């Protein structure tokens, strides 16, 4: 295994209703959660390629901005401008086999709305967590919407489908999406021994609504990766990297 490049992607699983009432969760994201994200981002802002970048689904980010105070909104806008808060192409995890075409189009539109507002590129990557399986409508929908990469993290108690570590998921139409499907919400820090590529995305996903990693954890991750791969390019990034 020859790893040339490692990208650390940091994310929290957004679950509206599992850990608290829905309104309480949304308010938490717009207050304490945002403050914690800002603290880690600020603490790592001078670390160059290792500055913390937090990736969110599009809809809770939009809702966070709508609900937060003007002071927090200004801070959030600054973090987005600095590239330390990012979002992917989907609004949240969903059961898309129960959705109609209109639902799918609306869902993809939330991320595009944020891209227009913040004048950022449209995301070409998507992430869903906590749903054990998805049907073949998903690659059709995503590829039609310009999404090229998908990460799926199934529940830890569920056995994932026996697929390669990274594969092309092809819809009946022939459209396809590059896909990773892991047991658990994210990936391991280090790539598996059978990883076939020279780039590794370490998707470090914290549990339901639990918030961002600390600056010290970011430094610890870097030290472990640098020890294992002394010649690799290591950086924090988003799913689009």
Give names to the regions the model predicted.
Residues 1-241:
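Catalytic-domain carbohydrate-binding cleft regions of carbohydrate-active enzymes
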